[in-house]
């Protein structure tokens, strides 16, 4: 409906084909301040209206767009013509991939049926790092959050530990909810991370360095959940860190790979199940990378 309403944005009403919602170069541009002249030149464009319409599906089925929307939203009250074009590109991606949503499966997930697990990752940036956490079950995401931390991190380790702490809160809430409906989690919920120092801090009481004292409360809270066997941090390589799609703008190949790991399509594709999948879903030959 958003595309139909704004068909005047494209020549002959034809929407360009987009494979990613946000390119690395566009992401870098959105970090720059908007000048008064640029805003005055673009203030009549319907930036907030279109942004709001795109945000709705990202809450439910287009979770892979969360990082793009998070970054674009920083210019909600002050935008330029260039940032409006970037917003339109995100809309084009959403329209191009409108047939790709979320696909849950039964018996295909290596973690087991109805077993909760999660991914937590963060970049390291000033003034605040961008973190992403994804909780999954039956091969597909059930929640995805991509947003800046509320505090300034002093190292990559601290940024990763902060995101782990935030992820433990999501996991604990979901474990309680699942317990109420009879889906008790008998084992600790795995939280995948790609930073070994952060994992060591969370699993070893003697490994908290002096420069990390400022995050004592978060570390202790996360560590308590590990000791209570509610969560278990597990290392995974950066290439397979699904939450990476919520921390930075990625190239086409890596974005599609992580997107389809998160939305469950890659798992179904790899299983060889006789299921008709959209053409833009990752090819079976690329899953084994």
Question: Where on the chain are the PLM-derived regions?
Answer:
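Long, low-complexity, charge-biased intrinsically disordered regions
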Residues: 1-289
């Amino acid at each position: 409906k958003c595309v139909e309403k704004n068909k005047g944005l494209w020549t002959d009403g034809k929407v360009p084909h987009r494979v990613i919602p946000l390119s690395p170069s566009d992401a870098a541009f959105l970090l720059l301040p908007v000048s008064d002249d640029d805003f005055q030149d673009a203030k009549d464009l319907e930036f907030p209206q279109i942004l709001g319409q795109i945000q709705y599906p990202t809450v439910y089925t287009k979770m892979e767009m969360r990082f793009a929307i998070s970054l674009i939203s920083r210019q909600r009250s002050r935008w330029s013509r260039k940032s409006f074009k970037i917003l339109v590109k995100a809309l084009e991606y959403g329209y191009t991939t409108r047939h790709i949503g979320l696909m849950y499966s039964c018996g295909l997930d290596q973690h087991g049926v109805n077993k909760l697990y999660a991914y937590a990752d963060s970049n390291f940036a000033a003034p605040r790092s961008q973190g992403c956490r994804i909780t999954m079950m039956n091969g597909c995401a059930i929640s995805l959050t991509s947003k800046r931390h509320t505090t300034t991190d002093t190292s990559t380790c601290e940024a990763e530990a902060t995101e782990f702490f935030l992820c433990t809160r999501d996991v604990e809430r979901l474990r309680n909810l699942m317990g109420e409906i009879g889906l008790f989690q008998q084992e600790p919920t795995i939280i995948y991370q790609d930073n070994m120092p952060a994992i060591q801090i969370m699993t070893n009481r003697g490994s908290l360095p002096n420069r990390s004292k400022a995050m004592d409360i978060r570390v202790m809270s996360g560590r308590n959940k590990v000791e209570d066997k509610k969560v278990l941090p597990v290392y995974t390589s950066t290439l397979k860190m699904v939450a990476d799609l919520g921390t930075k703008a990625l190239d086409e190949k890596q974005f599609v790979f992580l997107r389809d790991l998160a939305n469950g399509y890659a798992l179904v594709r790899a299983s060889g199940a006789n299921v008709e999948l959209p053409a833009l879903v990752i090819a079976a030959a690329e899953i084994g990378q």
